[in-house]
Amino acid sequence: MQQRSNRRSCSYIPLGVHNNAEKSLCTEVAPARKNKRSITTSPIVNINVVERRLFNLELEKQQLRAKNLSENTGGGSPNGGAYLDAKKGVREQDQYQGGPSKELDRLQPPPSMKKSPPRKKKSLKDLIYETNKTFYQVDSNKVKYKVGLSKKQLLPSKTVDN
């Protein structure tokens, strides 16, 4: 075979023996090119592109789960059947993982969503007293510091130079 005089170099790969034919049979193969995109693009990856791709992968996984659930139910009611099957799938996954079922956690709202008890209005003086009580031992006029500091340590020390 003749090699074309092209600016691209072609690589020749010897083929194995076919039907006991010639051992030195060679065929021309397409030129070994590197990925053009990897050559032309910068090595810095745009974070937004990666996030979008990951998000799309998550969407695809969810769509596949929905298809699998709908196939398993046999075309039952889309609302109730799929929901029950989803719970069943979650339970099975938990059993495989060996962990406890997290179904109870899902039924209860997170602590941040729970309503806090109604607050009582307190005077500023009472609030200051309570905060001081946590950090200091307050006893009428005497204040002992719980942190281990005394008033002398808090005041800047004065040095007397003669």
From Swiss-Prot:
GO CC term (a single one): condensed nuclear chromosome
Localization: Nucleus; Chromosome
GO-annotated molecular function: enzyme inhibitor activity
BP term (GO), one: negative regulation of DNA recombinase mediator complex assembly
Region (Disordered): 67-124
Chain intervals with Basic and acidic residues compositional bias: 85-94
Main location: nucleus
Keyword vocabulary terms for this entry: Chromosome, DNA damage, DNA recombination, DNA repair, Meiosis, Nucleus
Subunit structure of this chain's protein: Interacts with RAD51.
Function: Involved in regulation of meiotic recombination and repair of DNA damage. Inhibits RAD51-mediated recombination when the meiotic recombination machinery is impaired.
Name assigned to this protein: Meiosis-specific protein HED1
Source organism (scientific name): Saccharomyces cerevisiae (strain ATCC 204508 / S288c) (Baker's yeast)
Originating gene: HED1
